[in-house]
Amino acid sequence: MSAKGLGLKNKKQWLGLAHAAARAWLDAPTLELLGNGHIHQTFLLSDQEKPADRYVLQCVNSAVYGDIDLLMRQTRMVLDRLQTASAFAAEYQLPELISTRLGESVFVQASDGEMRSWRLWRFIKGSKTCDPPENRQQIRQAAQAFGAYQRALAGMEIEQLHETIPGFLSMSGYLRQFDQVLATATLAECEQAAPWIALAQSHRQWPSALMQPNGIIHGDCKINNVLFDQQGERVLSVIDLDNNMKGHWAWDFGDLVRSVAFSRGGFDVDDYRACLQGFLTGRGSTPLINEHLIYAPSYLAFMLGLRFLTDHLGGDVYFSVPEHGDNLQRAMEQFALFQSFERNKALMGRIVSECS
């Protein structure tokens, strides 16, 4: 979550704010913090009068998503599209937004001189995340779900969805931000991060085709954005629709490979093969460019490392961290993944040739 967008409050304060907001939906809510996302504050919400009913309550980060009306409008549009994609809707449960008792998509809360927007999702019963994945079958199933998600949205016109985060996943934009922050960073900060600044400066050139949007993407294909059943045997749902927008199809694939490698301690050739097989199955017969399947993991790992590094040098204004220096550590981890992907490009190329 962003320090600016949500405010730096302790757990007790956040629980108080969330409890007050939850009354826009329920008379007798109980709740607890849920997950450790970087962007939103999220809570598991129950109804004391109907304890079997559970929900996910989120405070949307307005510093990251400046136009919350646009965000919610597009979320509804995507959900409507997924509902009409019969094959996808038959295989996976769709996330369900719950309107307030006044029929609003969000509840706007005024507190401490700040305005906060809250939304409520129905909790998908019997679901859990598998992060890290326990086996390659889970990796393959997650990849297939994300591929099928792209396929379900393929009929939408690319211009129907606007950027919910201006410049999101734009390498050229992130490089400009990096340059701007680097120009004003302190000497001490630059010296501390010198090896990673040098790495960022030496890898500024990428295939131009990989940087051009060519379809609708999920935009946040982390392994924890699919929900499995309690046995971890089947994907129940694809969640987190905030970043659905136009993009390059390979960004979703690359981000999943990056996410799996990060959660399992590094690049593994069989994990990559499972991602590739699942994603290709989910996408169906749509022709894909092999080179992009090879470059995409490096592209996404480098991009995320660059974003963490930029935020560290700029004072941690986007990604919330307990201590200054944590974003630099995150950058180092992503850059290490990037270097691992670069070392294994030839191997990935052989696997792509085998599976295509």
Question: Where do the protein language model's features map onto the residues?
Answer:
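ATP-dependent phospho-/nucleotidyl transfer catalytic cores
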Residues: 32-36, 58-59, 66-69, 128-140, ...
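All-alpha amphipathic helical-bundle segments outside canonical DNA-binding/catalytic cores
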Residues: 137, 287-297
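ATP/Mg2+ or Mg2+-diphosphate-binding catalytic cores
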Residues: 303-356
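Conserved active-site aspartate in kinases
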Residues: 240
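Active-site activation/catalytic loop segments of kinase-like enzymes and analogous catalytic loops
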Residues: 250-284, 299-319
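Conserved ATP-binding subdomain of kinase catalytic cores across diverse folds
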Residues: 38-41, 46-48, 52-55, 60-176, ...
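Juxta-kinase regulatory segment immediately upstream of eukaryotic protein kinase catalytic domains
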Residues: 2-29
